[in-house]
């Protein structure tokens, strides 16, 4: 039998944990100064006023490499616990991990074919 009142603590926790960040966001908006001085609008590099233009545009290649790195970094995070408990989990989990790795390899091949890994 499913009793809804058994989950009252969960719903209270969910509502409170959702309201606290929203309240903090709105309170900081009301208490923050509305006008920004010239110091807030100037660039700041290690305590020294920058010489020349401080805004540099990065090439999109940096972002592509960073994106591929993040994908494979997350893969490592998911595969490490699986590798540590491989002998306990069995063959079905091995097949699931193999499918996961194959999907990532397909993504790598796609990025490679699109030229995301070429620097020139």
Curated annotation (Swiss-Prot):
InterPro entries: NAD(P)H_OxRDtase_bac/plastid, NADH_UbQ/plastoQ_OxRdtase_su3, NDAH_ubi_oxred_su3_sf. It is a multi-pass membrane protein. It is found in: Plastid, Chloroplast thylakoid membrane. Keywords: Chloroplast, Membrane, NAD, NADP, Plastid, Plastoquinone, Quinone, Thylakoid, Translocase, Transmembrane, Transmembrane helix, Transport. It is an enzyme of class 7 (translocase). The chain crosses the membrane at residues 9-29, 64-84, 88-108. NDH shuttles electrons from NAD(P)H:plastoquinone, via FMN and iron-sulfur (Fe-S) centers, to quinones in the photosynthetic chain and possibly in a chloroplast respiratory chain. The immediate electron acceptor for the enzyme in this species is believed to be plastoquinone. Couples the redox reaction to proton translocation, and thus conserves the redox energy in a proton gradient. Belongs to the complex I subunit 3 family. This is NAD(P)H-quinone oxidoreductase subunit 3, chloroplastic. It comes from Guizotia abyssinica. The lineage of its organism: Eukaryota, Viridiplantae, Streptophyta, Embryophyta, Tracheophyta. The gene is ndhC.
């Amino acid at each position: 039998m499913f009793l809804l009142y058994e989950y009252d603590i969960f719903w209270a926790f969910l509502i409170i944990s959702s309201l606290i960040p929203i309240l903090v966001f709105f309170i900081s908006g009301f208490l923050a100064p509305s006008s920004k001085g010239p110091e807030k609008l100037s660039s700041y590099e290690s305590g020294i006023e920058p010489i020349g233009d401080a805004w540099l545009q990065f090439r999109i290649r940096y972002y592509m490499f960073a994106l591929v790195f993040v994908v494979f970094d997350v893969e490592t995070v998911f595969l490490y616990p699986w590798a540590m408990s491989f002998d306990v989990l069995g063959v079905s989990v091995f097949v699931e991990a193999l499918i996961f790795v194959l999907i990532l390899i397909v993504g790598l091949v796609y990025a490679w074919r699109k030229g995301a890994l070429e620097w020139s």
